[in-house]
UniProtKB/Swiss-Prot annotation:
Name of this protein: Alanine--tRNA ligase
Keywords: Aminoacyl-tRNA synthetase, ATP-binding, Cytoplasm, Ligase, Metal-binding, Nucleotide-binding, Protein biosynthesis, RNA-binding, tRNA-binding, Zinc
Function: Catalyzes the attachment of alanine to tRNA(Ala) in a two-step reaction: alanine is first activated by ATP to form Ala-AMP and then transferred to the acceptor end of tRNA(Ala). Also edits incorrectly charged Ser-tRNA(Ala) and Gly-tRNA(Ala) via its editing domain.
EC nos: 6.1.1.7
Cofactor: Zn(2+)
Annotated Gene Ontology cellular component terms: cytosol
Domain of life: Bacteria
Intracellular or extracellular location(s): Cytoplasm
InterPro entries, sorted: aa-tRNA-synth_II/BPL/LPL (IPR045864), Ala-tRNA-lgiase_IIc (IPR002318), Ala-tRNA-ligase_IIc_anticod-bd (IPR018162), Ala-tRNA-synth_IIc_core (IPR018165), Ala-tRNA-synth_IIc_N (IPR018164), Ala-tRNA_ligase (IPR050058), Ala_tRNA_ligase_euk/bac (IPR023033), DHHA1_dom (IPR003156)
Chain sites annotated for binding Zn(2+): 569, 573, 693, 697
Organism: Roseiflexus castenholzii (strain DSM 13941 / HLO8)
Source species taxonomy: Bacteria, Bacillati, Chloroflexota, Chloroflexia, Chloroflexales
Similarity comment: family membership: Belongs to the class-II aminoacyl-tRNA synthetase family.
NCBIfam families documented for this protein: alaS
Length: 905
């Protein structure tokens, strides 16, 4: 058997099928394209699902891929098994070959045999093959069995199993069929090999390849007109076999990641062998984290984002168990990028963003971990003190709600102490919180969805791309939650038409406003929504007469407002492109608001955008506006739009046919004026934006007029926000800024051109005066403190000073204490002050006494209750605080007794 690297296995697999007429198709994203049924891509066939279902036609009938996959739950994987198990993974690569109605078993099985026995040179005597044994509904797969034997397999090595192991189903409807799996025995002694080990839990039998033969329609079990083939070979397992090891973690895919961890710790191989589980978990999770972030997922609290956060945090916690105290995961993820970036270029393209995101999330979690662990330990001690074995759900909830401590980590730490967590109680508290949130939140028109769902209406035809007015027939009316035949003057009403030019709020663009004019009345429209899919509903008030069902009304959108919205929306696309060009392709849209008076754009980026970057982004957008490039749209198949380079928004669901908005992307100069041509050449970048978008846009970029960024801020970890203005609003903002500039210039007595110099001079003067004032205050304070030294007392041979002073904050109080302690030479200083309305007590002991005869921390613990508070600290310095400032003199009176108690002890 050949010994091959993982890279060689991947390449030889793909090349083998390429040479046999297959198209090498790049891996799709870990985020399934336009498939809401899947959280992550978990097999090679996911990107071809619509092709297998007959919903999509590809320009080829044979394909081969190395597909990125992620499995974190369900039958395929349990996250807690990753690390302890020698072969479980979250992220993995699936090698596959596919036939879309082209070849079938008669060609697939001989090719599989040739690849395994000739190219990979696997020993035939170690291979086993399984086929479907048949049942009452489907006959046995004798054809596959015979083909394996014809290819060269020993008939005794071809085994038959039932549906559980050898029949594949996509869903209740669609293609299905028998599958044939190839298993290899990797044990040392061939005499111990037997058929009983196949499809068992024996680790010496490794399933390396599954060939699925789609030949039936699931709902009828009738033969398909064009049967297909879908195969999957796990690269990690194949590497394990080809490299002669018994764990995937001992292959060249994981060894560099484990070695990096050991290097960071300054540890050696025996350290790894003594703690394999956490090292392996970190190695696996670093791959999953790097690839998820590269594909656009950011850590968060819901959906895919929560899965990423959970994997990342589990890696960090596992790392802590082997000695990592500072952030380390980005260093390991860097090896993933270095190791796999050539095969998956998105890793290299987004390397900086990946590593910054990992580091930011890890540091945030370490802060959470530090606070949460100490709280959890106190809970564990409390439970154990009463002989309990279960951490109450209320405590687990408090850890999550107050400290951000995840339940799974609470469970893990509890298990390490022999305890469990009341998960039912935790879920009950979580549901109570969710219920409160639902009651408190005023979700727009939330109750309306139920009312409209009860009315059977066809989809509304939207005509607003072509104009801002048109006629439509009233299909239904709702007043006060009830369906009515007529709405009269003064009533708030919801109106559905069969067709409308009014745009319903969607994709960040707010809904239109305007009027509906009927034969007997008029309604003012204040908002437009889609409470149920496909149905556009106009929300407003009947101002005159009445509006009735089946009447034809004239729909008139507020054209001035719509034009302003279109300017904002087109500018949003230009901003998105500029962000990607300036910051990197990782700067993907994470949310937006498109309104007539402003736009807001959230995007993925880990650090503040610098002023220089903001200026360059703004420059590019305005250059694009001046170039007056055309804005066009077309409807086309989803896959065709992606192949044309259109940006599809992360997490958005698209139909089979999508609307692609193109801005610029002009190859020649035919569509541009001479001035625009010059502007485009002067700008120094290609003006081309393509996005999937259902919103409304201007006809040319020049209609935007002007673009100005007014703010840049953070909205969440790894997500930034830009707010901007366009058109007249941008001009007004610029005018206001100029007016402010002139006003400030007049106040400081300098022309606007010299304002910076004048402000610097004023600040320098202010700083000099502040320094002189501080020196004066310091002299006065020292004079006051010197006076206190006359009040030094003694308890036995211990000198002490106890006094109330005035201090603006605790920092100044400590400065006073330091000065007095140094002047005292040997002794104890106790100072008290009222700061922010509360009593603050500071105790300091000189080095000759601290920790030997006097403990400052114990001293303030004795004084704090007198002022209604608590405190503590080190032997040499401690602080306490309390609410009862009136009792400060009493606390100072008690210093002598407290010192006597310590000295006497």
């Amino acid at each position: 058997m050949k010994r091959l690297s993982s890279a060689a296995i991947r390449e030889q697999f793909l090349r083998f099928f390429e040479e046999r007429g297959h198209v090498r198709v790049p891996s799709s994203s870990l985020i399934p394209g336009n498939d809401p049924t899947l959280l992550f891509t978990n097999s090679g066939m996911v990107q071809f699902k619509d092709t297998f279902l007959g919903l999509e036609q590809r320009p080829y009938t044979r394909a081969t891929t190395a597909q990125k996959c992620l499995r974190v739950s369900g039958k395929h994987n349990d996250l807690e098994e990753v690390g302890p198990s020698p072969r479980h993974h979250t992220f993995f690569e699936m090698l596959g070959n596919f036939s879309f109605g082209d070849y079938f078993k008669a060609e697939a099985i001989p090719m599989a045999w040739e690849l395994l026995t000739k190219v990979f040179d696997l020993p035939v005597e170690r291979l086993w093959f399984t086929v479907f044994e048949g049942d009452d509904e489907v006959p046995p797969d004798d054809e596959a069995a015979q083909l394996w034997v014809a290819a060269g397999a020993d008939p005794e090595r071809v085994l038959r199993f039932g549906r559980k192991d050898n029949f594949w189903v996509m869903a209740d409807a669609g293609p299905c069929g028998p599958c044939s799996e190839i298993t290899i025995f990797i044990g040392d002694d061939l005499k111990e090999m037997s058929a009983k080990g196949v499809n068992s839990d024996d680790p010496n039998y490794v399933e390396i390849w599954n060939n699925v033969f789609m030949q039936f329609e699931r709902s009828t079990m009738q033969p398909l007109h064009r049967p297909s083939v879908d195969t999957g070979m796990g690269l990690e397992r194949m590497a394990m076999v080809m490299q002669g090891v018994h764990s995937t973690y001992d292959t060249d895919l994981f060894i560099p990641l484990i070695e990096r961890q050991l290097a960071l710790l300054g540890a050696d191989e025996p350290t790894y062998r003594a703690h394999v589980a956490p090292f392996r978990a970190v190695a696996d999770h670093s791959r999953a984290v790097a690839f998820l972030i590269a594909d656009g997922v950011l850590p968060g609290n819901t959906g895919r984002s929560y899965v990423l956060r959970r994997i990342l945090r589990r890696a960090v916690y596992q790392g802590r168990t082997v000695g990592f105290e500072k952030p380390f995961l980005a260093d390991v993820a860097a090896v993933v990028i270095e190791q796999m970036g050539a095969v998956y270029p998105e890793l290299r393209e987004r390397a900086d963003f990946i590593l910054e995101t990992v580091d930011l999330e890890e540091r945030q979690f370490l802060r959470t971990l530090s606070g949460g662990v100490s709280i959890l330990k106190s809970v564990i001690e409390r439970v154990r003190a009463v002989g309990g074995t279960v951490i109450p759900g209320d405590d687990a909830f408090t850890l999550k709600d107050t400290y951000g401590f995840p339940l799974d980590l609470t469970q893990k730490i509890a298990a390490e102490h022999g305890l469990t967590v009341d998960e039912a109680g935790y879920e009950r508290r979580m549901e109570e919180q969710r219920a409160r949130g639902r009651r408190a939140a005023q979700f727009k028109r939330a109750a309306d969805a139920e009312a409209w769902a009860d009315i059977d209406l066809p989809p509304t035809r939207f005509t607003g791309y072509l104009g801002v007015s048109g006629s439509g027939t009233v299909q239904a009316l709702i007043v006060a939650g009830d369906q009515v035949a007529e709405a009269v003057a003064g009533q708030q009403v919801q109106i559905a038409l069969d067709s409308t030019p009014f745009y319903a709020e969607s994709g960040g663009q707010i809904g239109d406003t305007g009027v509906l004019i009927g034969p007997r009345g008029r309604a003012r429209i204040d908002d437009v929504q889609r409470p149920v899919p496909g149905v556009i509903v106009h929300y407003g008030v009947v101002e005159e007469g009445a509006i009735a069902v089946y009447e034809t009304v004239e729909a008139q959108v507020d054209s001035v407002r719509r034009a302003a919205i279109m300017r904002s929306h087109t500018a949003t696309h230009l901003l998105h492109r500029a962000l990607r060009d300036v910051l990197g392709e990782h700067a993907a849209q994470a949310g937006s608001l498109v309104a007539p008076d402003r736009l807001r754009f959230d995007f993925t980026h880990t650090r503040p955008v610098t002023p220089e970057q903001l200026r360059e982004i703004e420059r590019r957008v305005n250059a694009w506006i001046r170039a007056d490039t055309p804005v066009a749209w077309q409807e086309l198949p989803y896959q065709a739009a992606l192949e044309a380079g259109a940006i599809a928004l992360f997490g958005e669901k698209y139909g089979d046919v999508v609307r692609m908005v193109t801005i610029g992307c002009v190859n020649g100069n035919d569509a541009l004026s001479p001035a625009a041509i010059a502007e485009r050449q002067r700008a120094g970048f290609r003006m081309c934006s393509r996005e999937l978008c259902g919103g409304t846009h201007v006809g040319r970029s020049g209609e935007i007029g002007l673009f100005r960024i007014v703010s840049e801020s953070s909205v969440a970890a790894g997500v930034r926000r830009i707010e901007a203005l366009t058109g007249a609003e941008a001009e007004q903002w610029v005018d206001a800024q100029i007016a402010t500039l002139h006003n400030i210039a007049a106040r400081v007595g300098a022309p606007p051109s010299q304002l910076g110099e004048r402000i610097e001079a004023l600040l320098a003067e202010l700083k000099q005066r502040q320094r002189a004032l501080d020196e004066l205050h310091a002299r006065q304070a020292r004079s006051n403190l010197e006076g206190l030294l006359a009040n030094v007392q003694a308890v036995g041979d211990i000198r002490f000073l106890a006094a109330q002073v005035e201090a603006p904050d605790t920092a100044r109080l400590r400065e006073m204490g330091d000065w007095l302690r140094d002047k005292l030479g040997s002794g104890v200083v106790v100072l008290a002050a009222v700061i922010d309305g509360k009593a603050q007590i500071l105790a300091m002991a000189t080095p000759d006494l601290a920790g030997r005869r006097i403990h400052a921390g114990n001293l303030v613990k004795a004084l704090a209750p007198i002022v209604g508070g608590s405190g503590g600290g080190r032997p040499d310095m401690a602080q306490a605080g309390g609410r009862e400032v009136a009792h400060i003199p009493d606390a100072l009176e008690h210093v002598a007794a407290a010192l006597a108690a310590q000295a006497g002890g």
